[in-house]
Amino acid sequence: MEEYLGNEDLLDRYLVAFFASREYSEEIAQRAVQWAEEICQTDKVVISGFHSPLEKEVLRILLEHKHPVVVALGRALYKRVPPNLQQAFDEGRLLFVSFRGYTRHSTKSSEIRNWKAAGIADEVYFTPFNRFSLLSTLHFTYEKYSKTPVHILE
């Protein structure tokens, strides 16, 4: 059961999912920053768990540019909006989506969150990942079986 907190109208806009591996080079980090800055020049809404370090950096850039975001949670909704997200929330540029009612975050809930976020996105972007990453299965499945455009930031 999905639960929402924030501006649900963001779901009616063009959604771009962003997933980043926890392991990345400085070159990949620079490419992700460049991608985030380019996205800020569009009206696309970025959806992600914003959980990995690189995803958090992309979120920081999006918020700095006052760009709308959907924060996908693999756990229950926050009881209070985190301070770093409060302004975006107050300005209607933020939506939290909970795909699981669990109170604790886990690897499995992260995986489910990523699949659900990709499932509602109009386009999906990944940073490079190794073949053992949880992102590998998601990427392979979407690239092979989905009509959703899939990209890897090279």
State where each predicted segment sits.
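Glycine-biased, small-residue-rich flexible motifs in mid-sequence functional cores and linkers
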Residues: 1-154
